[in-house]
Each structure stands twice: as C-alpha cells, then as structure tokens.
A protein has these predicted regions:
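Conserved ABC ATPase "signature" region
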Residues: 33-43, 123, 135-152, 171
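Pre-NBD coupling/linker segments of ABC/ABC-like ATPases
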Residues: 1-54, 243-264
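Conserved catalytic segment of ABC-fold P-loop ATPases
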Residues: 224-231
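H-loop/switch region of ABC-family ATPase nucleotide-binding domains
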Residues: 216-217
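The feature captures the beta-strand-to-loop junction immediately N-terminal to the Walker
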Residues: 71-73
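Conserved ABC ATPase "signature" C-loop
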Residues: 234-235, 250
Length: 265
C-alpha cells in the first residue's frame, strides 16, 4: 500500500501487523526426497501444523524526514519487521503503507547473486530498486567509486568478504535516491573509514528530509541518529516513543534481567 508523498504526510504507517511462520521439523540427515515428502505430508495434515508468530499486532507511524530505530534482543522480530517494511514479506493480518520509493539494505548480500560479478549485481539491484537501465548507467561510476571496489568489480560476489558485500550494497542503495532507506545492522561490518563515509552519506540523506529505519544493537547509534524508536519483545511492540526514552527503558530491563540471572547462579 502506498501513502501520498506530500510534505506533511507520514512516510510509514503500520496498523495491527502480524506475521507468522510454520514450524517444520525435518530430520537433520534427511535426503532431499525425504524432505519433500515430509513437507508434502505436513501440508496435507493441517491440523498438526505449528506456527510461530514472529511479529504480533504491531502498529506505529513514522513522519517524513524522521529516523526510526528498532531495538530488541535476538529473535525479537526485528529482521522480520524490516522485511515487512521492504515488502519482502506480506503481513498475515494488518497493513503496511509506505510513501514513495524504498531502498532496503537488510541482511548483507540478500539481493546479490553469488555467481554474478559486482558489475552485474549493480545492474540487477538497480532494476529491482526501480532504476531504469539508463539511470543505472548514469550512476554506475559513482556507485563503484563509493564502494571502493574498482579492482574487484568484475569478480563474482561469492569471492567478496562480508565487508565488501556491505560496501557495494550500501553504495547501490544510497545512489537509488529513495524516499525511505531501511538499514539492518549495516554499519557493524567493515572498516571504520568506510563506516564513517556511510554515516556522512546518511547525514546528507537525513538532511534532505528523507526517512530512515535503522536496526542496531548499538545504543549509541540509536540515540545519535533516531528521533523515535520501537522496542520489540518476542514479536510484540513493548514500547514506541522518543528514541532516548525507549533505549533507557530497554536497558533498564536488560539490567534487571542480568541481576536476576546473577542471583540465580
């Protein structure tokens, strides 16, 4: 669903969004044929199917030009929520509405084909993110220069390190010039010099009244960059509000849990 892109409009609106996944138990050493037979059996035997709710009844909105942080423990639903925002997943219930074009930079290399070269992946990702062939050609040199991968651009992606993946993925995403930029732990990989270059480009993006959604375990980064934040806990939204308030509440709970664990041990 798309929202109007007028200057006073909200950039993102989620209403009662839920997403669940079926739990499938496959023996560790099952053959491919055994796996297919097992999946077909489970599909037919619907009454015995088990599901896990990765995101449960989440509602919030983000204003245009705001930066939203998403925090929570591992397994709390952060990555699933980002994939819902990106349109990779469709919600089982509720609605996700975005104003304008989105550039998702989620799990590193998620949209890259490992057997394609960096050059080929720039073209494919540019098309996926909405650029025309002419626009990709026009921005190609800038993307390569920003990624600092000139020497490796004709190597297959499977030869890239995780840092190199991030360099190229960020360079493509930021040069698409989107209205909404989704970033999932992207600055946790790579050297500090490149991370600083990414932060400078993010600042320019933010100053241009664009919207950013940022997942990070770095509380300092959430405080520095984000206007508001969402705290997810087992798929549910525990808190939504000013970033500093949400981070403080999250850290208080972590501190209490740590003290309780120490007493038990």
């Amino acid at each position: 669903m798309h929202l109007p892109t007028s200057s006073n409009a909200r950039a993102i609106v989620l209403e009662n969004v839920s997403k669940r996944f079926r739990v499938v138990s496959i023996p560790k050493h099952a053959s491919f044929k055994e796996t297919i037979v097992r999946l077909d059996f489970l599909k037919r035997k619907k009454r015995d199917q088990r599901f896990v709710e990765a995101v449960r009844n989440v509602s919030f909105s983000v204003a245009r030009a705001e930066t939203l942080g998403i925090i929570g423990k591992n397994g709390s639903g952060k990555s699933t929520l980002m994939r819902l925002l990106a349109g990779i997943y469709k919600p089982d219930t509720g609605s996700v509405a975005i104003a304008g074009e989105i550039a998702p930079l989620l799990s590193l290399g998620i949209s890259f084909h490992p057997d394609m070269t960096g050059r080929e992946n720039i073209r494919i990702n540019g098309l996926v993110l909405g650029l025309s062939p002419a626009e990709i050609k026009q921005r190609y040199l800038e993307i390569v220069a920003f990624s600092e991968l000139e020497e490796f651009i004709d190597f297959p992606e499977r030869t890239y390190s995780s840092g190199m993946y991030m360099f190229l993925a960020f360079a493509v995403a930021i040069n698409v010039d989107p209205d909404v930029l989704l970033l999932d732990e992207v600055l946790s990989v790579g050297d500090e010099a490149f991370s600083e270059k990414c932060r400078i480009r993010m600042r320019a993006f933010k100053d241009a009244a664009r919207t950013i959604v940022l997942v990070s375990h770095d509380a300092g980064m959430i405080r520095q960059w984000c206007d508001t934040a969402v705290w997810l806990d087992h798929g549910a939204m525990r808190m939504f509000g000013p970033a500093n308030d949400v981070v403080d509440a999250y850290h208080r709970e972590l501190h209490v849990a740590s003290n309780e664990a120490a007493l038990i041990s």
